[in-house]
Amino acid sequence: MAPTEQPVRTFRFERDTFAFPHELVWQYHFDPVTGTMTTFNSNPPPTYYHRCFVMVRSTRQFFYHARFAPELPPVAPEACQRIIREVVSRNPRRACAESERVMVPGYDGLRSFSRAHEPLLKAEMGGAWQSYFLRSHWRMVFPVHRWQQKRMGEKLKQSLPQRGLSLVHLFRFPRITINHGIVLYGLAESEQNLEFEAYDPNIPEHPVKLVYERKRRVFTFAPSRYWGGGVLSVVEIFCDWPY
């Protein structure tokens, strides 16, 4: 594990997440009796999609490398473009020193900044290909065993306080019913579960929860507009080699 060496700030959902959603290519319907999933094209068609991993990576880059200064006046769009390019060019695995952070004047966090500059952020954070070509994607094609998920749960429990937020890949394979990235930023622990509080780029309105069940040694994710709920595989990404 290679956690950040810099002091970790507290991540706040209402301040440190994007105001706009990652859009769905399809709309999903889940049969309440059988659980069968059917899909149909979104109407109107989405304009910002296949970038969930771009968004979770960028969330961390702003958390690790930006310093928001609401007391200063906002700058022109051209300057905002330079700010965004600088932040998303930084290392998503390690925070910089406080003195090296990129100043973002006029806003108190990523949510207010992204509300004001949505088109710029979408244009500059990276294309859909960056969601497909992640060095960690090799892991999803190999079996994920319960003992490995137990280790992953404990790893996330240990690393989250050091990193400030952890990025994870949620998937089912070989039948790909989910292939998605979210941001973990909080943890509630009991004898039965590790309950991670998370930001889902598909659902910017409120936090979601990813649960590790100790008895079954599995991760579960609640039903949503794009996932029927249940057990899935979890791998931490943008962390240590080879992820």
Where are the regions that the model predicts?
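Cys-His-centered catalytic/binding microenvironment captured across papain-like cysteine peptidases
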Residues: 2, 175-179, 188-243
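Active-site-adjacent substructure of cysteine-protease-like catalytic cores
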Residues: 144-189
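Context-gated lysine
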Residues: 122, 150, 155-157, 209, ...
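Cysteine-nucleophile protease catalytic domains, especially the papain-like/related folds used
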Residues: 7-146
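Residue-identity detector for glycine
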Residues: 35, 106-109, 126-127, 153, ...
